[in-house]
């Protein structure tokens, strides 16, 4: 099966200059865990909810809430994003996407059509496909779990 058949189409993308609080709002309102980052229309990175959380000051900080807000609004996604993210072309296979995500220990991939971001494929998308195929093949999921099986 091709990536384009399972991906989330037309993902929300952000510019490198977007402040972290704005990225947080987009992620929260849209239920996204990752946002492709563009500079002059070209993919240059990906920012995840984890990147955003790690950029926040710890609870043990001695900064006041006003100082924290001041600093956070000046940090952009460019400063915390993963640069040159692993991508896959839309005509690639789901199996290849799964392998890339496993090899790189990531939860999703920007999907490209040439140099343009046209989608996102995630581990969740792959798992849904797996469950749909299992159901189609008559596997109910009621069997004993295979603890530690790979």
Model-derived features: positions:
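Tandem CBS (Bateman) regulatory domains
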Residues: 1-10, 48-86, 98-102, 122-150
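Short, charge-rich amphipathic segments
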Residues: 28-36, 55-57, 62
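The conserved cystathionine-beta-synthase
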Residues: 14-31, 38-39, 81, 87-105, ...
